[in-house]
Each structure stands twice: as C-alpha cells, then as structure tokens.
Amino acid sequence: MNNFVILPILIPLLSAILLIFMTKNLMLMRIFSTAASAIGIVISGILVQTVFTKGIQTLSLGGWKAPYGIVLAADQFASLLVLTTAIIGLLVGLYSFRSVGEKRERSFYYSGVQFLLAGVSGAFLTGDLFNMYVFFELLLIASYMLIVLGGTKIQLRESLKYIVFNIVSSALFVIGVGFLYAVTGTLNMADLSVKISESGQTGLITVIGVLLLLVFGMKGGIFPLYFWLPGSYYAPPAAISALFGALLTKVGLYAITRVFTLIFIHDTAFTHQLMIWLAALTVIFGVIGSLAYSNVMKIVIYNIITAVGVILFGVAVHTPASIQGAIYYLIHDMLIKGALFMLAGTLIALTGTASLHKMGGLIKRYPVLGWMFFISAISLAGIPPLSGFVGKFKIAEGGFAEGEFTISMLILLSSLLVLYSVLRIFIHAFWGEEKETPKPNHRTAKGLLYPAAIFLLLSLLFGLGTEWVSPYVDQAAETLLNPEKYIEAVLKE
C-alpha cells in the first residue's frame, strides 16, 4: 500500500479548489497553476519509476481492503498515462497565457483545467468501475465548463450537443455498472475478473460488456459514436481543444483497454472481433473526414478519430506486439495531438482564418512554425524513426500474426492518407503565393510556439529514445496481457 498513489489526483484537485479564490490576481493564478502542474509531473515521474522497480502500487482508502473499499491501483500502463497527462496539463497551461484571453482566464479557467486533470488521473488510477464513473463525471463537468467559457455562439451550440450526448453515455454507464453488480456482487475490477471467470453466465456478461463498450466508445469517439466530437473540439479556443484532443478520447480508450484485458476476456471471439471491425470503420471514417475538409482545425480533429481506430485495433487484436503498439501509439498520439492543436491554433491566430484557401506563403514570415508543423505532420503519420512509427508497426505486426491481413494493411495505408491530409495544411499554408494576413506579431508567435516546441521535442524523444522507453512499455503491456498480476496486487491484502 502506497500513499503516493493518490497524489496525482489530490494535487490538481486541491489546486483547482484554491484557484477558485485567486481570480482577482491573474499572475498568481498562472504561477500557481503552472507550479501545481510541474509538481504533478515530478510526482507522476516518481510513480512511474516506483512501479518499474517495485511493481504495481495500490492504496486502500479509509482502511477498507479490496474488494470492499475504494482502491487506487497504479500499474505501469496507468502510471505512464498519468505522467503524460501531467505533462499535457503543464504545456496547455503555458500555451493558455497567450491564447485564451484574460477574460476567460479570470473566469475560473485554470481551476477548470486542474479539475479536468484530477478527473483524468483518477480515471486512470481507480481500481473499481463505480469510481471510474465518478472520475468520468468530474472530468466531464470540468469539460462542460471549459467548452462554454467565453459564451460564443458556436460554443453554446456545440456544447449543448456535447453535454446531452455525455449525459446519455453516463446514464448508460450507470445502467451497465448496475447490471454488472447485480450479476457479480462487486465492482472492484480485479474482483470482477475473478467472479466472472467463476460465474458461468457468459452470455449475460457478454451483453453487459457490449453495453460498456458502447459507453466507452461514446466517450472515446469510436464509429459510429464520434459525431459529437468534431464540433465540440472545434468550438473552444485552441488551448482547450489541445487539452480535449490530447486527453478526453484517451480516457475512453483507456477504459476499453482496461476492462477488455481484465474483465471481459471470457468471449473474445465475439467482443474483440466486434472491436476489430469497429476499429476498421473508425479509421476509414476518420481518414475520410480529414480529407474532406479544408479547415485546419477540422483536419486535425478528424485525425483524432483515425488514431482512435488504430489504437482500438491494437487492443482488440490482443497479442504482445499489438498491445505494446497500442500503448506506444496512445502516448504518441497524446503528445503529437497536443503539438498539432497548438500549431494549428497558432496558425489561425496569426492569419485570422482557419481556411486553407485563405492561407499561403507563410514560410517566409514564420519559418520556424512551418518546419515545426512539417515535423509534426510526418510524426503523426508514423514515418520512421519518429514516435508514431513504432506503435503503428507493432500494431500491424500483431494484426498480421493473428491473420487480420486486410485491416492491418488498412492501418498501414492510413499512414499515407493521414500524411496527405496534414501535408495539405503545410503546402497550402506555408508555400505558394503569400496571402494578405494581419500584421505579424512575433512576440505572440514566440509565446505560442514555445509550448508546442516542447510537445514536439518530447514526441521526437519518445520516438528516437525507443530503446530507453521500451522497458516501461513492455512492463505495461505485460500487466495487460497477464491480468493475474493486477489481480494479485489489488486483492493481496
């Protein structure tokens, strides 16, 4: 039992509450929020290393042992995602200084960001489904506030769709959890794994599993449940879009990965095959969307959907290579989507438009921005040796090993189409005839580029430093592939 496990949740939660009382002092809010996020990175980094050297860390809150009490469990998969979340929180905060506007900043913006980070980290670390629901609600309430902050017409329109859709998904989550408790008498995920293997009610459990796949698919943006995503991520400022794009769909994917490698593993011939086909359709429709638009932000947003499909395929194939690849690609996508949203937001801020047809020749004025965008584009597409390559290659390798040749080829082909979709932005915006744009503001450009540059650097290091990263990813994959290790760590006391 390790009290350290709760700190990635507790620090942003307490910070969010304290930030509510600091709205009159903008500089204090910025400093405090940045410091809280930096401390979160340090704490999460220590947690990753502790899990690597000492194994899965658990904490039973209130002294109630599992499966009766609330348990937090940090395996390497959860710990790596918590660390990535903390990094994203810090960099989005830095980007916000120059992008969201003072009015939004004073309207409890930083408090909302910290509440969201607490909810995301809690969803990663919780050991039971009910508290996963609680943390989902915490991050969703924070996201409701952030998406409407500013009160523009498009924000109010898209937020209504976003809120209604998530209320429905949350209601279905409660129903699914209730059914599962009625059948098994427990909601602790480790205990559920044991009880389901002993229950013999495979048909009913499979139905509940499909219901939870629907719930997490709604939150993760899986076909055909992603229709809420493009508008909702497009409506708020770029900093909030970066936060949403890097984190929110990943929580849904994490939940799918956790429950379908730990709990619902009794009927993989049906559940995992269903996930494979949903993954393929998600990739196809994500690619179509990214090619159909000439709006910079919409192109980036639809590439989120493509990535969701790629990761889901890796989880569904469920081989050592594909699970490792899914973890690599999940972390890669969190980092590179953060960079791309920031770069797209910077591009829009400097040109005053999101339309590719109204951009051109920007490489002369903003060469650093141009080449940063190019590197982000090829990294997103998975061009070797950048970070997207390792994950996508391993996912395809696992798919080929399981005989999923057609969909594995689709995953590889999607790299070329993703590359084409984002290179359209690079070619139209930075090359060709220079279009009339607002007077250059190099001070603003630099302030916006620094956080994006750090994101891009981390993404490059993640790809080029595969040899250093792989032991951590391998350990994370091993726990997912051998759930008895997680079960033993949680139920041992």
Curated annotation (Swiss-Prot):
Subcellular location as annotated: Cell membrane
Disulfide bond residue pairs: none
A GO MF label: NADH dehydrogenase (ubiquinone) activity
The family this protein is said to belong to: Belongs to the CPA3 antiporters (TC 2.A.63) subunit D family.
Name of protein: Na(+)/H(+) antiporter subunit D
Keyword Ion transport: yes
Role according to the record: Mrp complex is a Na(+)/H(+) antiporter that is considered to be the major Na(+) excretion system in B.subtilis. Has a major role in Na(+) resistance and a minor role in Na(+)- and K(+)-dependent pH homeostasis as compared to TetB. MrpA may be the actual Na(+)/H(+) antiporter, although the six other Mrp proteins are all required for Na(+)/H(+) antiport activity and Na(+) resistance. MrpA is required for initiation of sporulation when external Na(+) concentration increases. Also transports Li(+) but not K(+), Ca(2+) or Mg(2+).
GO terms, biological process: ATP synthesis coupled electron transport
One cellular component (GO) term of this entry: plasma membrane
Lineage per the UniProt record: Bacteria, Bacillati, Bacillota, Bacilli, Bacillales
Miscellaneous remark of the record: Mrp-dependent antiport apparently occurs by a secondary, proton motive force-dependent mechanism, but the similarity of several Mrp proteins to membrane-embedded subunits of energy-coupled NADH dehydrogenase complexes raises the possibility that there is a capacity for electron transport that could provide a primary energy coupling option for Mrp functions.
Quaternary organization: Forms a heterooligomeric complex that consists of seven subunits: MrpA, MrpB, MrpC, MrpD, MrpE, MrpF and MrpG.
